[in-house]
């Protein structure tokens, strides 16, 4: 077959295959155009989940009558005019591909009017054939009608799912849009009935989060807001015990654009690795803001993906911010708002004095509701209440490098006996005062508003683990030279990474030199991990550096070893504790980072409110 120029209609239909995957894709493109046009209200009307009809009305700036034919030409746009504009683009759309692609696979009508015009205009297109622009009564703004989607591409229509499934994709996209644009009023109707309505309002308000993501998410949300290095990350992450079986509540926005990015998702999951139960996924809504010139949004036909100019910096920034937020949670205390000054130094947009975190007034009972309401507390923890001192010196952990793990169990702090805490001495601490031990496994404590139940082994395990990590961090990373250098055969690409990242590997305890196109010579390894298959560990490190530009393999291997040591050193089930020992454990929990979960991600405690206990016995009815 000879080479030939494809007709314009076929070119647009090919482009539609990339841009228009399903009705939700059409809704996305058209509503993003409305937002770029300054709309504050968008109405979405659907029939048969968008297959029969999609109608988008907005109150944006509108278009002049003579611009309507231009709007449906490929690569005609008002948003960029040069390469410099493309590199700094801040609008959601910019290519000028969506309208001609949609019009080529549907019966398409475009109506618009500017506020300064006496009347609007309408343009109809069927199968890529343009009609004439004629005057038409229309309010200021734009209306787009898409009828019989894929009517002329029956093969594509056969691949559409059931009506309920296609509608679900549109509703999920509308939810994502409402999160990104709290100032936008969005109405979604299906088959003549109002399905969703998102009113404009404060993004962090109790009602809006509950409306979009549900009560459980809102009640477990931790505020994130951190700036530095020209970056800002803000939004909400949830407590680890609100993890999900699927990654279905993970929303990431880069400069207001909803995207999927493996590097950022990897950074968030690593930040949760110490507190997340195996096989579970964190939930979050995160907004990353940076100079548009530092991110390339023109890498995916549907603009679902972006490429960062400094992916390693972004990964590290997200990881440290999320990890710092999680680290500030203490058992029994309401979660705090994390601002710029809370995570590794001061940044550009520090939280002003007196600014508090969002307060969620709703409360839920039950063992699953571990942290009660969400609010800011600025009072020092446990003022005037004696606590168990931590006298563990870093020198006590030097044996970690000289002895096998079985000889260093004493490094894990043992349960200490403190003076009984009188219930009348000062304010009641967050986890209250111990009153009994249940079956040698659980501690029962009376708190200000109910009953606290603590898994004593899991709680002590976390306390010991965090102390071991702090002690090890005080010592620093030590290396162990090998008597005989180890030769490691790798792919040439991995050898290139090892050569380029020699300083990074050295900071992790590996002294590695390249000895051939596909071979490395390893002269030293991390001392603490000398028995942890260093060859496999190094391969994993190189894989991470190649894929993400960042690695925590050594830290994770170290933490796994320390977690095992803490587990073996923790108080065992069925050991009877005195009241003072139980109170000592409760005070340590309140002072320990991430003490709401054990080293394996299981919860360490639960609260039952007095109101809930009253309901058990039908009191007050």
UniProtKB/Swiss-Prot annotation:
UniProt keyword DNA repair, yes or no: yes
Family annotation (InterPro entries): DNA_mismatch_repair_CS, DNA_mismatch_repair_MutL, DNA_mismatch_S5_2-like, HATPase_C_sf, MutL/Mlh/PMS, MutL/Mlh/Pms-like, MutL_C, MutL_C_dimsub
Gene Ontology cellular-component terms listed: mismatch repair complex
Entry's transmembrane regions: none
Gene Ontology MF annotations: ATP binding; ATP hydrolysis activity; ATP-dependent DNA damage sensor activity; mismatched DNA binding
Entry keywords, A to Z: DNA damage, DNA repair
Keyword Membrane: no
GO biological process: mismatch repair
Record family assignment: Belongs to the DNA mismatch repair MutL/HexB family.
PANTHER family associated with the record: DNA MISMATCH REPAIR PROTEIN MLH, PMS, MUTL, DNA MISMATCH REPAIR PROTEIN MLH1
Function in brief: This protein is involved in the repair of mismatches in DNA. It is required for dam-dependent methyl-directed DNA mismatch repair. May act as a 'molecular matchmaker', a protein that promotes the formation of a stable complex between two or more DNA-binding proteins in an ATP-dependent manner without itself being part of a final effector complex.
Protein name per its UniProtKB record: DNA mismatch repair protein MutL
């Amino acid at each position: 077959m000879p080479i030939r120029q494809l007709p314009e209609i076929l070119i647009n239909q090919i482009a539609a295959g990339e841009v228009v995957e399903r009705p939700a894709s059409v809704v996305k493109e058209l509503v993003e155009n409305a937002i770029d046009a300054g709309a504050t209200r968008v109405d979405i009307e659907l029939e048969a989940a968008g297959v029969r009809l999609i109608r988008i009305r907005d109150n944006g700036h509108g278009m002049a009558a003579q611009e309507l034919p231009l709007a449906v030409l490929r690569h005609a746009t008002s948003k960029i005019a040069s390469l410099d504009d493309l590199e700094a683009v801040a609008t959601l759309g910019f290519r000028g591909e969506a309208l001609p692609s949609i019009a080529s696979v549907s019966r398409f009508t475009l109506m618009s009017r500017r506020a300064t015009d006496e009347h609007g205009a309408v343009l109809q297109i069927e199968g890529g054939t343009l009609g004439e622009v004629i005057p038409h009564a229309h309010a200021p703004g734009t209306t787009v009608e898409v009828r019989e989607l894929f009517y002329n591409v029956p093969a594509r229509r056969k691949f559409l799912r059931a009506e309920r499934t296609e509608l679900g994709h549109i509703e999920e996209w509308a939810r994502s849009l409402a999160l990104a644009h709290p100032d936008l009023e969005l109405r979604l109707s299906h088959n003549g009935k109002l399905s969703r309505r998102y009113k404009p309002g404060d993004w962090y308000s109790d009602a809006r989060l509950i409306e979009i993501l549900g009560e459980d998410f809102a009640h477990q949300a931790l505020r994130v807001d951190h700036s530095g290095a020209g970056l800002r990350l803000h939004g909400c992450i949830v407590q680890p015990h609100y993890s999900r079986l699927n990654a279905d509540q993970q929303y990431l926005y880069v400069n207001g654009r909803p995207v999927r990015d493996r590097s950022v998702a990897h950074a968030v999951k690593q930040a949760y690795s110490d507190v997340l139960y195996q096989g579970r996924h964190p939930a979050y809504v995160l907004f990353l803001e940076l100079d548009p010139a530092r991110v390339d949004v023109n890498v995916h036909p549907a603009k679902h993906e972006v490429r960062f100019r400094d992916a390693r910096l972004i990964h590290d920034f997200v990881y440290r911010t999320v990890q710092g937020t999680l680290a500030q949670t203490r058992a029994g205390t309401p979660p705090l708002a994390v601002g710029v000054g809370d995570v590794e130094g001061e940044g550009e947009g520090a939280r002003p004095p007196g600014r508090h975190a969002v307060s969620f007034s709703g409360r839920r009972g039950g063992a699953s509701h571990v942290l009660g309401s969400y609010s800011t507390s600025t009072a020092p923890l446990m003022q005037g209440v004696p606590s168990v001192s931590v006298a563990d010196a870093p020198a006590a952990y030097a044996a970690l490098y000289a002895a096998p793990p079985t000889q260093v169990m004493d490094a894990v702090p043992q349960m200490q006996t403190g003076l009984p805490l009188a219930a009348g001495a000062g304010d009641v601490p967050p986890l209250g005062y111990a009153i009994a031990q249940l079956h040698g496994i659980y501690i029962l404590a009376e708190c200000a508003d109910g009953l606290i139940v603590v898994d004593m082994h899991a709680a002590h395990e976390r306390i010991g683990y965090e102390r071991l990590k702090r002690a090890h961090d005080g010592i620093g990373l030590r290396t162990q030279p090998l008597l005989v250098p180890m030769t490691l055969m790798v792919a040439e690409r991995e050898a290139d990474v090892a050569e380029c990242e020699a300083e990074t590997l050295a900071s992790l305890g590996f002294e590695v030199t390249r000895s051939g196109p596909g071979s490395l010579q390893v002269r030293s390894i991390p001392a603490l991990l000398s028995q942890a298959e260093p060859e496999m560990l190094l391969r994993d490190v190189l894989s991470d550096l190649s894929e993400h530009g960042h690695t925590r393999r050594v830290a994770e291997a170290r933490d796994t070893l320390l977690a095992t040591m803490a587990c073996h050193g923790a108080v065992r089930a069925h050991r009877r504790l005195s009241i003072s020992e139980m109170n000592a454990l409760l005070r340590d929990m309140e002072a320990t980072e991430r003490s709401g979960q054990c080293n394996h991600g299981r919860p360490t405690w639960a609260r039952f409110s007095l109101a809930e206990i009253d309901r058990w016995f039908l009191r007050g009815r």
